[in-house]
C-alpha cells in the first residue's frame, strides 16, 4: 500500500460538547476539498484504505461507527486519540469542543496501470 493523500481538517461543536458532531465536521472539512480522481479513473475506489485519526479531549465520547460511516469509499480504520480542545464559550462555561482530524487514503500500487515515481 502506498499513501496517496493526507488531508487535515478541524471540526467544532460550539454548543453542547458533542464530540462525535465535532469529529464529523472535521472529516467533512478534510475531505470536501479533495477529488481523488485516480481511484475512479482506475475503478479502484472500493480498494482504497482510509485511515482516520480524530483528536479530541474525551476520545471515549466519539462514536467510531458514525465516523467510519462518514467516509464514502474504501476500507476505513478509525483511531481516536486524546487531543483537540475544550474551551469556554461566551457564557463562561466550557461548552466548545474542537476536533482535529487527519484523513489518509492508501492504494495498493503493485501490478497497477500507473507507476509512482521515486524522487
List PLM regions with ranges.
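A generic structural motif
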Residues: 10-14, 58, 109
Amino acid at each position: 500500500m502506498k499513501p496517496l493523500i493526507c488531508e487535515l481538517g478541524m471540526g467544532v461543536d460550539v454548543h453542547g460538547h458533542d464530540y462525535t458532531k465535532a469529529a464529523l465536521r472535521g472529516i467533512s472539512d478534510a475531505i470536501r476539498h479533495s477529488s481523488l480522481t485516480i481511484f475512479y479513473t482506475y475503478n479502484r475506489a472500493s480498494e482504497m484504505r482510509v485511515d482516520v485519526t480524530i483528536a479530541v479531549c474525551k476520545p471515549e465520547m466519539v462514536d467510531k461507527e458514525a465516523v467510519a460511516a462518514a467516509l464514502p469509499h474504501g476500507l476505513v480504520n478509525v483511531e481516536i486519540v486524546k487531543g483537540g480542545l475544550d474551551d469556554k464559550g461566551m457564557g463562561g462555561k466550557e461548552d466548545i469542543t474542537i476536533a482535529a482530524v487527519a484523513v489518509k487514503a492508501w492504494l495498493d500500487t503493485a501490478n497497477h496501470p500507473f507507476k509512482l515515481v521515486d524522487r
